[in-house]
Amino acid sequence: MSLPSGHTTGHTDQVVQRRARCWDIYQRRFSSRSEPVNPGMHSSSHQQQDGDAAMHGAHMDSPVRYTPYTISPYNRKGSFRKQDQTHVNMEREQKPPERRMEGNMPDGTLGSWFKITVPFGIKYNEKWLLNLIQNECSVPFVPVEFHYENMHASFFVENASIAYALKNVSGKIWDEDNEKISIFVNPAGIPHFVHRELKSEKVEQIKLAMNQQCDVSQEALDIQRLPFYPDMVNRDTKMASNPRKCMAASLDVHEENIPTVMSAGEMDKWKGIEPGEKCADRSPVCTTFSDTSSNINSILELFPKLLCLDGQQSPRATLCGTEAHKRLPTCKGSFFGSEMLKNLVLQFLQQYYLIYDSGDRQGLLSAYHDEACFSLSIPFNPEDSAPSSFCKFFKDSRNIKILKDPYLRGELLKHTKLDIVDSLSALPKTQHDLSSFLVDMWYQTEWMLCFSVNGVFKEVEGQSQGSVLAFTRTFIATPGSSSSLCIVNDKLFVRDTSHQGTQSALFTLVPTAFSSSVPAFSQEQQKMLPS
C-alpha cells in the first residue's frame, strides 16, 4: 500500500527532527564523559551549533558514534602525565649508569667525588673491609680518607664509574658472621685531604703559569682565572675541570713563590705597619678572636719572627694557652695504701737489695716461690748504638717488642727459683740507692700484693764501673713465712738515665726515708754491708 508523497515527506521530517532532539539530549548527557579519539572528529563535533536538522541527520548517519569505552578527559590527562614520566625515564635510561651517579653539589656544580658508607662498619677492620670490597668490585679504586663516624665506615672515591661499581657491590659481600654488607653511595664535596694534596709536578706547572700571568708592575695576579690559562688547560693537570682544587693549591704556591702579590683589599689593612711590627687590634688575620690573648697568640704563631707587637717587644707564643713558665706536676712519691703495707714492703725491699748488692745472690733463694718466673728487658737492640753499660744485658733481654722469635722468648723467661737466682748472679754487681726508690702499690688482695719499684743503681765492677742506670721492677708476691713476702713473678726493666749530678748524691745504703719507718738491720745483716 503506497502513501501519498506529501505524507511521506512530512513523516521523514518528523523522524529527522526526533532524531535531532534525541541526539542533543544524548550529547549533553555524555559530552563530559566521552570524546572522539580522532582529533579531526573531535573538532567536527563542535560545528553542530546551527541547529540544522539536516546537519544533525548527516552527523547521525556518519560512522562516528558514541563509544562508551573511550578514555575520559581526566584519565587522558593522567595518561599524558604518565607518558611524560615515561619519556623522562626513557631519557634517564638512555644515560649511562656513570652519568646517573653524578650528583649536584649544594653550590650547583656537578661533583665527581662520592662518599661511600658501610653501615655499622665500625665492627670491621679497615684493611679487611677494603680488601673484601675490592675483590668483589669490577674496577680498582683508591679509598681516600677512610674513617669511622657514628658507627659507620666511610671513605671517598673520585669518578662516577667507580662509585657505580661500588654501588653494585652492595649486598653481594658477607662478613664473617654470614651477614650481608650494604654499601651506600652519595655525591660529596672534595675531601679535605685532597685540598692539601698536590704533586710536585703540578706545583711546578702552577708556578710557571703564575709567573707568566703575574703583573709585576702592579703586583697583581688573577687567581680565579688561573685554571683557565692556556698553560693549565693544555697540560693534563685536571685543574680546569676542578677550579676549587686549583685555587687551594695556588694560594699555597702564591705565598712562597710570589710573596709580593697581595690579595685585593689587603693593601689598606697593612698601611702604616712597618716590617717586623704589628698591632693586635688592627690585624686582619685575627678578627675572629674576641679576647686579646688569643689574638696575640694567633699573630705570634703566624709570624714567629715578629720583633715588635703593639709597640713593645713581642713575647713568645704560648701553646694551647699554657704559660711557658708553668711546669708539669711533680711526682707525688710512693703509694702503699696503708701504713702496715708500707712497713711490710719497705722492710722486704731493704732485705732483698741488701742481699742483692752483697755480691752473693744465692741468699735470694728464700725470697722466691719454687715455681716463680723472672724476665729482664732493656729498650735496645743488639744492633743499636746503646751505652756500653748495657752490653751485659743484651743476651738476657726479653723485650717482646723487639724479640719476635717465640722460641727465644720462652728460653729467656726464667722459671723456678733456681734458674732465677742463677740468672741474677750472672748480672753485673751493683749498688742500689734506696733513697731514690719510688714504690707504687697498684693491686692488693688478702693473698697477693702487686707493686712496682722505680730507682737507680750503679755498677761497682767491670768495664762499666761507676755507670748509673735506672730501673723499674715489678713484683707479684704472696704472704710468706715469718711475716715476709714470697715472690711469684719478677720483671726487671733496665734503662739509661739522664739525671744530672746523680752519682754524687746517691748511694747511702740506709737512707732516712727508710730508717724512720723500718726496723734497723740486725747484727748479722750489718756484717753483710760492704765496708
UniProtKB/Swiss-Prot annotation:
InterPro entries linked: LRR_dom_sf (IPR032675), NTF2-like_dom_sf (IPR032710), NTF2_dom (IPR002075), Nuclear_transport_factor_2_euk (IPR018222), Nucleotide-bd_a/b_plait_sf (IPR012677), NXF_fam (IPR030217), RBD_domain_sf (IPR035979), Tap_RNA-bd (IPR015245)
Annotated localization: Nucleus; Cytoplasm
Effect of residue 300 to R: Inactivates CRM1 binding
Molecular function in Gene Ontology: RNA binding
Bias-annotated ranges (Basic and acidic residues): 83-102
Record flagged with keyword Nucleus: yes
GO BP term, example: mRNA export from nucleus
NTF2 domain ranges (all copies): 344-494
Domain RRM: 113-192
Keyword list, A-Z: Cytoplasm, mRNA transport, Nucleus, RNA-binding, Transport
Listed Polar residues bias regions: 41-50
Pfam families: LRR_NXF1-5, NXF_NTF2, Tap-RNA_bind
Residue ranges, annotated region (Disordered): 33-59, 83-106
Any one GO cellular component localisation term in the record: nuclear RNA export factor complex
UniProt keyword Lyase, yes or no: no
Entry text on domains: Lacks C-terminal domain that mediates direct interactions with nucleoporins.
Assembly with partners or alone: Interacts with NXT1, NXT2, E1B-AP5 and CRM1 nuclear export factor.
PANTHER family listed in its UniProt record: NUCLEAR RNA EXPORT FACTOR, NUCLEAR RNA EXPORT FACTOR 3
Job description of the protein: May function as a tissue-specific nuclear mRNA export factor.
Name of the protein in question: Nuclear RNA export factor 3
Organism: Homo sapiens
Gene name of the encoded protein: NXF3
